[in-house]
Amino acid sequence: MSLLTEVETPIRNEWGCKCNDSSDPLVAAASIIGILHLILWILDRLFLKCIYRRFKYGLKRGPSTEGVPESMREEYRQKQQSAVDVDDGHFVNIVLE
């Protein structure tokens, strides 16, 4: 029998947790920190893309328009929209023979 097997095999009366009746504040703090860490890790895995996209791009959706005349705002909106619009006439059909 290897040493590892002997270490992994507990004695019957040692199956219970030794810290059940412990009122040590360090044990309580470690338990709370462990639970919070687990919750935060799960939330991080679930909302990974959303959270890091927020950090990367911030809370704003675009540049601030404060103090910019309305005509310039409209011009900016039109440029943004024209960059998004796709002209259907410029597609190229490639036929493989």
Swiss-Prot record:
Regulation of protein activity: The M2 protein from most influenza A strains is inhibited by amantadine and rimantadine, resulting in viral uncoating incapacity. Emergence of amantadine-resistant variants is usually rapid.
Localization per Swiss-Prot or TrEMBL: Virion membrane; Host apical cell membrane
GO biological process: protein complex oligomerization; symbiont genome entry into host cell via pore formation in plasma membrane; symbiont-mediated suppression of host autophagy
Record bears the keyword 4Fe-4S: no
Function per UniProt: Forms a proton-selective ion channel that is necessary for the efficient release of the viral genome during virus entry. After attaching to the cell surface, the virion enters the cell by endocytosis. Acidification of the endosome triggers M2 ion channel activity.
Note: When the channel is activated, one or more imidazole moieties of His-37 probably become bi-protonated.
Annotated domain remarks: Cytoplasmic tail plays an important role in virion assembly and morphogenesis.
Protein name, UniProt field: Matrix protein 2
The gene coding this protein: M
